[in-house]
Design a protein with these regions (language model features):
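Conserved, well-folded catalytic cores of nucleic-acid-processing
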Residues: 25, 43, 79-83, 106, ...
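A structural preference for short, hydrophobic beta-strand core positions in alpha/beta folds
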Residues: 35, 183-185, 342
Length: 354
């Protein structure tokens, strides 16, 4: 049996960490599993490198959402299956909607009978559930809700952050609000729920529903035009033996958060990944200007040079985002006396707004 699942979910919902935990768990306990990282920037995504450093069989599809590259996705899946992989999971960009139609129906129509599609899976973190339950409203609520409307399977992630009663309460609410989907809770950190997720993907199939989500309509376009993407890859030469890579990542994330907040913008997800030639690496995440910076993985030893990948998605005009993040990288790198060599940089708006 060969299964393929799309993991949708808003920025910071835990798609990458869940895919890493799931593929490692499934490979250990059941059969070979692999993951695909997908985003709009060029090659060298932070998520893909992080997955590989974490020991996963991982690859990436870049420059386009997998919604629009069915042929490339199909070729990748066929290659994995030929190598004996029974489960492949891929995310989509964190602001993406419409993958149920474009990916699942696209594959089934272009390659009838060739791919066994697992339940269309949407991850949601507790913070997002709390926001939706509060009915406070927000500029990106259309995306948050629409992703869940598409789901066959809703995965409440990061359940280690909640009491068991709160987990049950959130699951009840999700099932009531989105009755066409099953809902389960998992923790990529502790491993809770990974067996249930593995079994759900392998033993169930996609419903192939086509809910009306207003794709391409005015609300969709208004939401998308607020979003911008930033991708940066660089090499940093370290001058001093006492360089602290973890402090550098924290300070850089803090500086970007401060700059974004001062500009009256929001950054739902910033990913900072750095690694040394010796194989040691560190990763920092920022999931919004009002939230603490998370050190997902820490350097364990000093290093003399770093490769750094920065990926960010923000509700901010792209030209402004470019200036804010680029200036922060220069300021903090100068403070740490790092000599930078920029390999690539991209910054663009989903609506090309100024």
């Amino acid at each position: 049996m060969h299964k393929f699942a799309v993991f949708s979910g808003f920025l910071g919902s835990g798609k990458t960490t869940t895919m890493i935990a799931l593929t490692k768990y499934h490979t250990t306990h059941h059969g070979k599993a692999a993951m695909i990282s997908n985003d709009l920037g060029g090659k060298g995504l932070a998520d893909n490198r992080y997955a590989q450093l974490s020991g996963c069989n991982a690859s990436e599809i870049t420059d386009e959402c997998i919604c629009y590259v069915n042929e490339q996705l199909a070729d990748r899946l066929k290659a994995y299956y030929a190598d004996g992989y029974e489960l492949v999971v891929s995310d989509i960009p964190g602001f993406g909607v419409g993958a149920l139609d474009h990916v699942y129906h696209g594959l089934s129509e272009k390659y009838p009978g060739q791919f066994d599609l697992a339940p269309f899976t949407v991850l949601v973190e507790p913070e997002t559930v709390s926001h939706l339950r509060s009915r406070e409203g927000g500029d990106l609520d259309y995306l948050l809700n629409t992703q869940l409307v598409e789901a066959d399977l809703i995965v409440l992630s990061k359940c280690d952050l909640l009491t068991s009663d709160r987990v049950k309460e959130n699951l009840v609410w999700l099932r009531e609000q989105y009755p066409d989907a099953e809902a389960i809770a998992i923790s990529a950190l502790t491993g809770q729920g990974l067996e249930a997720l593995s079994q759900a993907l392998m033993t169930h199939t996609a419903s192939m529903r086509r809910p009306d989500i207003g794709y391409g309509g005015p609300v969709f376009m208004e939401s998308m035009t607020r979003l911008s993407e930033y991708y940066l890859q660089y090499h940093a030469a370290v001058c001093c033996n006492d360089f602290d890579g973890n402090a550098y990542l924290r300070d850089l994330a803090t500086s970007i958060r401060t700059a974004i907040a001062a500009a009256g913008c929001e950054i739902p997800h910033l990913k900072l990944l750095a690694w040394a030639a010796e194989g040691d690496y560190g990763k920092a995440d920022l999931l919004g200007i009002s939230r603490d910076i998370q050190l997902a993985h820490a350097f364990t030893a000093p290093c003399t040079e770093l490769a750094v990948v920065l990926n960010g998605s923000a509700a901010c005009p792209y030209a402004r985002l470019d200036t804010l993040v680029t200036d922060a990288v220069k300021e903090i790198s100068d403070r740490y006396q790092l000599e930078l060599m920029i390999f690539s940089k991209e910054c663009f708006g989903m609506g090309e707004q100024e």
